[in-house]
């Protein structure tokens, strides 16, 4: 099939319509010409999100939930997700914002926008304190386990007995849970087999 006549006719119609638009454009009033010539505003105003703080990691959903005040959060089956607001343009960050000035701030969970916001300050520092506290408790437990009892006397022996009982109890509970899961699995398989036999019989 030859496309040349189709293309030629389309070009002819397109170029024939161009002078008519130029004539119509000349008939416009001077006021309309001024409106056309005025440049559009360079940047449109976009709403800024009010942030209480900025998280060191966006994977920390609790921190993001705490810091971003104007996001509508929706509970989905898998996770909590932001809903409704598109992300506005981000302001350019300076070099001092990118590079941390103090080495002590690197371990913080987040950085507060206002230094006087005590609730934010406590939230951002809490994670670090809890981590330190849990490591201290773990260290104390390990230290107590490794310490010989004759120096501390009956109290140490009693503590070790209690810890041993707790461990045995936890092991017994986990074993009973495993056993109940095995029994439930066997019952499900038995029921499935009986159902297959019943279906084949009918």
Swiss-Prot record:
Q: Which InterPro entries does the UniProt record give?
A: Endothelin, Endothelin_toxin_CS, Endothln-like_toxin
Signal peptide location in the record? Answer: 1-25
Renumbered to this chain, region (Endothelin-like) spans 110-124
| A GO biological-process term | transcription by RNA polymerase II
Question: Which GO cellular component term is one of those annotated?
Answer: cytoplasm
What ranges does the record give for the region Disordered, renumbered to this chain? 28-47
Cysteine-cysteine disulfides: 53-67, 55-63
Question: Propeptide positions, renumbered to this chain?
Answer: 26-50, 74-202
Q: Would the keyword Mitochondrion be found if you checked this record's keyword annotation?
A: no
Per the UniProt record, the site (Cleavage) maps to 73-74
User: Could you tell me the superkingdom of the organism this chain comes from?
Assistant: Eukaryota
Q: Name one GO molecular function term.
A: endothelin B receptor binding
Q: Does the keyword Disulfide bond apply?
A: yes
**Location of this chain's protein in the cell:** Secreted
* Keywords, alphabetical: Cleavage on pair of basic residues, Disulfide bond, Secreted, Signal, Vasoactive, Vasoconstrictor
Annotated PANTHER family: ENDOTHELIN, ENDOTHELIN-1
Summarize the protein's role: Endothelins are endothelium-derived vasoconstrictor peptides. Probable ligand for G-protein coupled receptors EDNRA and EDNRB which activates PTK2B, BCAR1, BCAR3 and, GTPases RAP1 and RHOA cascade in glomerular mesangial cells. Also binds the DEAR/FBXW7-AS1 receptor. Promotes mesenteric arterial wall remodeling via activation of ROCK signaling and subsequent colocalization of NFATC3 with F-actin filaments. NFATC3 then translocates to the nucleus where it subsequently promotes the transcription of the smooth muscle hypertrophy and differentiation marker ACTA2.
The record's similarity note reads: Belongs to the endothelin/sarafotoxin family.
> What is this protein's record name?
Endothelin-1
What is the phylogenetic placement of the source species in the record?
Answer: Eukaryota, Metazoa, Chordata, Craniata, Vertebrata
């Amino acid at each position: 099939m030859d496309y040349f006549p189709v293309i030629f006719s389309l070009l002819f119609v397109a170029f024939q319509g161009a002078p008519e638009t130029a004539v119509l454009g000349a008939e416009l009033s001077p006021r309309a010409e001024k409106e056309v010539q005025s440049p559009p505003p360079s940047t449109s105003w976009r709403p800024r999100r009010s942030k209480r703080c900025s998280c060191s990691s966006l994977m920390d959903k609790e921190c993001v939930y705490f810091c971003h005040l104007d996001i509508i959060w929706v509970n989905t089956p898998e996770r909590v997700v932001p809903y409704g607001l598109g992300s506005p343009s981000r302001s350019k960050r300076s070099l001092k914002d990118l590079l941390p000035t103090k080495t002590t701030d690197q371990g913080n969970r987040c950085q507060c926008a206002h230094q006087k916001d005590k609730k934010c300050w406590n939230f951002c520092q809490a994670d670090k304190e809890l981590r330190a506290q849990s490591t201290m408790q773990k260290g104390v437990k390990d230290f107590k386990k490794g310490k010989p009892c004759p120096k501390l006397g009956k109290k140490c022996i009693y503590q070790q007995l209690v810890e041993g009982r707790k461990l045995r109890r936890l092991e017994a509970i986990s074993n009973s849970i495993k056993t109940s899961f095995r029994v439930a699995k066997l019952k499900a398989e038995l029921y499935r087999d009986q159902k297959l036999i019943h279906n084949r019989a009918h």
